[in-house]
Amino acid sequence: MYPEDSRVSGGVATVDFLEGTYDYAAPTPAPTPLYSHSTPGYYSAPLDAHGPPSDGSLQSLGSGPNSPLVFVPSSPHLSPFMHPPTHHYLETTSTPIYRSSVPSSQHSVSREDQCGTSDDSYSVGESGAGAGAAGFEMAKEMRFCAVCSDYASGYHYGVWSCEGCKAFFKRSIQGHNDYMCPATNQCTIDRNRRKSCQACRLRKCYEVGMMKGGVRKDRGRVLRRDKRRTGTSDRDKASKGLEHRTAPPQDRRKHISSSAGGGGGKSSVISMPPDQVLLLLRGAEPPMLCSRQKVNRPYTEVTVMTLLTSMADKELVHMIAWAKKLPGFLQLSLHDQVQLLESSWLEVLMIGLIWRSIHCPGKLIFAQDLILDRSEGDCVEGMAEIFDMLLATASRFRMLKLKPEEFVCLKAIILLNSGAFSFCTGTMEPLHDSAAVQNMLDTITDALIHHINQSGCSAQQQSRRQAQLLLLLSHIRHMSNKGMEHLYSMKCKNKVPLYDLLLEMLDAHRVHRPDRPAETWSQADREPLFTSRNSSSSSGGGGGGSSSAGSTSGPQVNLESPTGPGVLQLRVHPHPMKPTE
């Protein structure tokens, strides 16, 4: 494409190229802007595809694939909407580019560019201090709602949020709204689906940091208040505050847990209001599972134990996911997370079973399609006593009219209280950060007391109910010990197929017990607890009789987590051991 000749008529020059004729605006004294609002943005065309004429005073402006090529001179009479001479396709990480002030409907910028660009990149470059200030103003405008990812209208209730989420959170905290999720408390909340589930939307509001007070104490507001006191500007503090405000919600929560009050993640958990704790606990509840196993009646000992151990293995996976959602649990060390779960897993499963069976007298609801009564559990040797204790505790729950908020608090207390006192003579190591676990336990206990205080009863009745609820935990611990002994005896008799995750938890509990018989454990059991072993040895532990106890391998806990530190991962094998007829 080379120009052959040019003709000027009425201020418009016509250039004849080999492939066609194009018009461009020649320099005229009239300050008429040539920019049209109907031509949005620029597209990244090759630099040498449509080069300017040889005079070098013109600059190419692409208006889209279907529009003719228009050349506009770089004169001082350009429209104020014109982009600076440096184009987007020249943008690199080493040269900061300032976005133009074109409205969002005309200038499309991807969300990744808006979120991924930090405030520190908007420094004064080749365009001067004026362009740097304009870029900084645009960076402040490019905010997204931390809840639904829509465009944020401002800093509301401690986070950047849109008008819709701000109004929703305001209505929720002013009124008494008992939202219930119709699904599994894991609904996706975005711009299009934020109105589909109010419970998950409110839960996400609390997760991203919305607070009733309206101001996060550890955010940039403190920075501006200190700046007004001293009257001086600290550039390092300002950049740190801006980076904190523009970080994603996950990074903000990590920053809060590591910098609040000098106490790590403990301060953020302690300062959490009781209503928020209760909402997080209810949102962390796992869904009700299905057995999906068709077994002919009447049940036999092998079929009942196979059904129960299969359901227990499935529930263990969901129990680990539930524990991760507890406030402050992921801030614990991996050793403490594993130890708490291994010490309380059967108690947690039992209180969940009792809660599901609270409205069905005489029956235990293990799953939606697995409901057993005492007569069906009596076919297993030693199971009738455990069934009677479970049904009696469910009757006690029903008599006390246990509420969902009280149940989730008791369930979390069982998990955290299991590591409060380490065994003196066992192989169980003490918790690395027992103070953090105690702080979590105190926070959840305060939430339970706060909920009881809102019942409107007298102080004496409130104190009595607190004692009645906490006394239930001793019964659940007693049932757990009975169930553990029964499950281990079934394993030794080779009457039940133990799945890998269930076997790991069972063996870990036996290793942790101080009163276990020393002669029943081999040298392999005295190896370090948290080591990865071959799964075939653990599956073969049910070979029969007392020899199975001697060859039982320890729990297989994968410490090298691919998802980062503080995330518990237990190795789960999909193929269980087949029962021996």
Swiss-Prot record:
What is this protein's gene name? esr1
The segment annotated Hinge runs over: 211-272
Question: What does the annotation say about its assembly with partners?
Answer: Binds DNA as a homodimer. Can form a heterodimer with ER-beta.
Q: Where does the source fall among the domains of life?
A: Eukaryota
DNA binding happens at which residues? Answer: 142-217
Composition bias (Basic residues) maps to 572-581
Q: Name one GO molecular function term.
A: sequence-specific DNA binding
Which intervals of the chain are annotated as region Modulating? 1-144
Q: What is the annotated role of this protein in its UniProt record?
A: The steroid hormones and their receptors are involved in the regulation of eukaryotic gene expression and affect cellular proliferation and differentiation in target tissues.
Annotated protein name in UniProt: Estrogen receptor
- Subcellular compartments: Nucleus
Q: Which InterPro entries match?
A: Est_rcpt/est-rel_rcp, Estr_rcpt, Estr_rcpt_N, NHR-like_dom_sf, Nucl_hrmn_rcpt_lig-bd, Nuclear_hormone_rcpt_NR3, Nuclear_hrmn_rcpt, Znf_hrmn_rcpt
The NR LBD domain extends over: 273-509
Q: Where is region (Disordered) located?
A: 45-66, 99-123, 216-269, 514-581
Q: Where is the composition biased (Basic and acidic residues)?
A: 216-246, 514-528
Enumerate composition-biased segments (Polar residues).
Answer: 56-66
Write out the domain note.
Composed of three domains: a modulating N-terminal domain, a DNA-binding domain and a C-terminal ligand-binding domain.
Hey, which family's this protein in? Belongs to the nuclear hormone receptor family. NR3 subfamily.
Record's keyword terms, sorted: DNA-binding, Lipid-binding, Metal-binding, Nucleus, Receptor, Steroid-binding, Transcription, Transcription regulation, Zinc, Zinc-finger
User: NR C4-type zinc finger positions in the chain?
Assistant: 145-165, 181-200
What Gene Ontology cellular-component terms does the record carry? Answer: nucleus
